[in-house]
């Protein structure tokens, strides 16, 4: 999970606490997320869009999709306008979800891609 908000990262981690087959890695911004992506080679990436630094969620998504490990990317944002969703999908997102998301929503999304 890539999000600059520590509470969101904690909520995602706790959502998967009972899912023994899921290991959650956390990054605080797009740069750290991209580095972690290359180190860990995850099965799926959940990322916020609006983050500080040089790499936002849209750029992160594009870079992941351009890599050899084209894992699914779920963009999660407070921005829910159709134009925002279109930008996310154009960046290569497999799913675009608007915050807030329930733990069961997160689990269902991940299971759809990793089952």
Predicted regions and their residues:
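Alpha4 helix (beta4-alpha4-beta5 surface) of REC/receiver domains from two-component response regulators
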Residues: 59, 80-95, 108
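Two-component/phosphorelay signaling modules centered on CheY-like receiver
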Residues: 6-25
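Conserved phosphotransfer cores of two-component systems
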Residues: 38-40, 64-70, 91
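Active-site beta3 strand of CheY-like receiver
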Residues: 40-46
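Acidic catalytic/metal-coordinating carboxylates
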Residues: 29-32, 55-59
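C-terminal output helix
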Residues: 101-110
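The short loop immediately C-terminal to the conserved phospho-acceptor aspartate in CheY-like receiver
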Residues: 49-52, 79
């Amino acid at each position: 999970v890539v999000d600059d908000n520590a509470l969101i990262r904690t909520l995602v981690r706790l959502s998967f606490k009972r899912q023994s087959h899921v290991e959650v890695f956390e990054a605080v911004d797009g740069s750290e997320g991209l580095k972690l992506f290359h180190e860990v080679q995850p099965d799926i990436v959940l990322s916020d869009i609006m983050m500080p630094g040089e790499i936002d969620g849209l750029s992160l998504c594009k870079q992941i999709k351009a890599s050899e490990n084209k894992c699914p990317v779920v963009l999660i944002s407070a921005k829910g306008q159709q134009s925002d969703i279109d930008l996310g999908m154009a960046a290569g997102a497999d799913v675009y979800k608007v915050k807030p998301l329930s733990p069961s929503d997160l689990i269902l999304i991940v299971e759809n891609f990793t089952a």
